[in-house]
Regions:
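Conserved glycine-rich "GG(E/T)P / GGGxP" loop and the immediately following alpha-helix
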Residues: 46-66, 153-158
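Hydrophobic residues within beta-strands of alpha/beta enzymes
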Residues: 46-48, 80, 105-107, 174, ...
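Glycine-rich, proline-tolerant flexible connector loops at the mouths of alpha/beta enzymes
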Residues: 50-59, 112-120, 183-185
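Canonical Radical SAM [4Fe-4S] cluster-binding loop centered on the CxxxCxxC motif
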Residues: 1-30
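Auxiliary Fe-S-binding modules of radical SAM enzymes
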Residues: 32-33, 39-42, 66-78, 92, ...
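Structured catalytic core of nucleotide-sugar glycosyltransferases
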Residues: 2-3, 35, 82, 144
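Conserved alpha-helical substructure of the radical SAM core
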Residues: 20-47
Length: 223
């Protein structure tokens, strides 16, 4: 996984250990360096993610697109997955990603609707769901993907309701993993979810028609 556009985020989500503050200027050579790194490592699948860049008019979506194009130019047989922020719901920014044609467009819901305000700074469940639906309803030919972190205070039935929502908008891939607290300053772990519950999430999600679900304690959205 490559994280682009710096190491400083404009948001401060309760589960995340990325620095928050004023981000650096964009490095115009970074897309090429990412592409060269993919080439050097002979990757067959590359994941590109980023910090939130609410300081940029397009949220950094054009820079994302440039990186996708460079990776594909130097590595035509490599599939590209992007894990993107919500771009504040800006359809033009999302179009930049779609038009760059990644094989997988991933945007994480992270948690259930009730906990969104506590856990995801400046984001919302509805906006994220709309992003995924917009990609699916557009000319995007790749797969849509999202991830949930459990053990942060959600109830079993709330996760099932999210899976039902995702099935309604034809999301292709869902990951569900255990929350692990990065530091003592971050949101406490509410509980450790047992393996049987992860199995139930997978089984029920598949019964709703979701094609691919990875559900387990160590599952993470970026690989």
């Amino acid at each position: 996984t490559f994280m682009i556009m710096g190491d400083t985020c404009t948001r401060a989500c309760g589960f995340c250990d990325v620095n928050t503050g004023k981000p650096c200027d964009l490095d115009d050579l970074e897309p090429l360096r990412v592409a060269e790194s993919v080439q050097t490592m002979e990757l067959t699948h590359a994941v590109i993610t980023s910090v939130n860049r609410d300081d940029l008019p397009d949220g950094g979506s054009a820079f994302f697109a440039k990186t996708i194009h460079e990776v594909k130019r130097l590595n035509p047989s490599t599939s590209v997955e992007v894990l993107i922020p919500d771009f504040k719901g800006d359809r033009g920014a999302i179009d930049n990603i779609i038009e760059a044609s990644p094989e997988v467009l991933n945007h994480n819901l992270e948690t259930v609707p009730r906990l969104q305000r506590e856990i995801r700074t400046a984001a919302s469940y509805g906006r994220s769901l709309s992003l995924l639906q917009y990609a699916k309803d557009s000319a995007f030919l790749g797969k849509t993907k999202t991830g949930l972190i459990v053990g942060m205070g959600e109830e079993f039935e709330e996760v099932i309701a999210v899976l039902e929502d995702l099935s309604q908008i034809n999301v292709d891939i869902v990951t569900i993993g255990q929350y692990l607290r990065p530091t003592a300053k971050h949101r406490p772990i509410h509980r450790y979810v047992d393996k049987e519950e992860f199995v139930k999430y997978k089984s029920i999600g598949e019964s709703f028609g979701i094609p691919h679900i990875e559900s387990g304690p160590l599952v993470r959205s970026s690989y």
